[in-house]
């Protein structure tokens, strides 16, 4: 078995899962959807959804109910990168070899795209209820996802980093 080929196969599968959950670029919200999709499709290792999937399987998970959570996890990660790149934070112009979201769509749309990715992540994760409406673990998983992305998780960590950087 070639581990690099196996990892690339998994990354390709995850890319397809993510694409299935992205919003269609249409309607009066088209610009925000374009900015969201631009951000999340800019590449990346897809390590977080890969680890989530493998952990799910390790503990006996077999259904596709994990897939909306995999996409949601990558949306949350991407939102954090979009916001991190903003002028008020790190003011980066490039990420993964491409112009950052705010560099392409403007600062205001960069903020909105990050916000939209975070909210859309929870809309996406909630689609797991459509697959298994009686699965109580979905609610627990959503609670964990929210906590780990929020003030007691990723956002809280970024606040600490911002304070340290300011001093």
Residue ranges and their predicted role:
Residues 124-141:
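Inter-helical turn/loop segments and adjacent helix faces that build the functional surface
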Residues 10, 14, 137-144:
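Extended, well-ordered alpha-helical scaffold segments
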Residues 140-158:
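Conserved ATP-utilizing enzyme core subdomain
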């Amino acid at each position: 078995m070639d581990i690099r080929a196996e990892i690339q196969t998994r990354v390709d599968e995850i890319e397809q899962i993510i694409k299935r959950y992205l919003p269609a670029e249409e309607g009066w919200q088209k610009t925000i959807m374009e900015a969201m999709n631009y951000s999340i499709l800019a590449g990346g290792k897809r390590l977080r959804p890969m680890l989530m999937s493998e952990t799910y399987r390790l503990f006996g998970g077999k259904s596709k109910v994990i897939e909306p959570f995999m996409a949601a996890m990558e949306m949350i990660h991407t939102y954090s990168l979009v916001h991190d790149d903003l002028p008020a934070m790190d003011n980066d112009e490039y990420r993964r070899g491409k112009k950052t979201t705010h560099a392409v769509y403007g600062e205001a749309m960069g903020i909105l795209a990050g916000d939209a990715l975070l909210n859309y992540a929870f809309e996406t994760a909630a689609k797991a209820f459509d697959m298994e409406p009686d699965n109580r673990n979905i609610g627990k998983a959503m609670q964990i996802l929210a906590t780990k992305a929020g003030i007691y998780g990723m956002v809280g960590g970024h606040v600490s980093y911002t304070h340290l950087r300011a001093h």
